[in-house]
Curated annotation (Swiss-Prot):
Residues 1-20 form the signal peptide. It comes from Mico emiliae (Emilia's marmoset). GO terms for biological process: antigen processing and presentation of peptide antigen via MHC class I; immune response. Belongs to the beta-2-microglobulin family. The lineage of its organism: Eukaryota, Metazoa, Chordata, Craniata, Vertebrata. The keyword Cell membrane does not apply. PROSITE patterns: IG_LIKE, IG_MHC. This is Beta-2-microglobulin. It is found in: Secreted.
Length: 119
């Protein structure tokens, strides 16, 4: 009985230690298909390797938040870091700029990564 109590306490201590670990998210912005002006595509923002799980992700068009955005369920890797995919349909052209803005406890201000149509 005492042994199981000790094991339970050690498990709780190790889980509470996970809260202290913080990892900044890696942000990747890319289109599903090679960009062609006037041709519908999907804009993706893949955010990975972050901890804790609280995060805010916005896709932007010309600096303004895109409202119709979908995302995957929050998932975690073998190292207990988290990852998410945010995506929306868009039609690239010469004038519009697209980006992904991420707010996380590891950033003092939100980080914005622009979409590079050549990637």
């Amino acid at each position: 009985m005492a042994c199981s109590v000790v094991v339970a306490l050690l498990a709780l201590l190790s889980l509470s230690g996970l809260e202290a670990i913080q990892h900044a998210p890696k942000i990747q912005v890319y289109s599903r298909h090679p960009a062609e002006n006037g041709k519908p595509n999907f804009l993706n923002c893949y955010v990975s390797g972050f901890h804790p799980s609280d995060i805010e992700v916005d896709l932007l068009k010309n600096g303004k938040k895109i409202e119709k955005v979908e995302h995957s369920d929050l998932s975690f890797s073998k190292d207990w870091s988290f990852y998410l995919l945010y995506y929306t349909e868009f039609t690239p052209n010469e004038k519009d700029e697209y980006a992904c803005r991420v707010s996380h406890v590891t950033f003092s201000t939100p980080k914005t990564v622009k979409w590079d149509r050549n990637i």
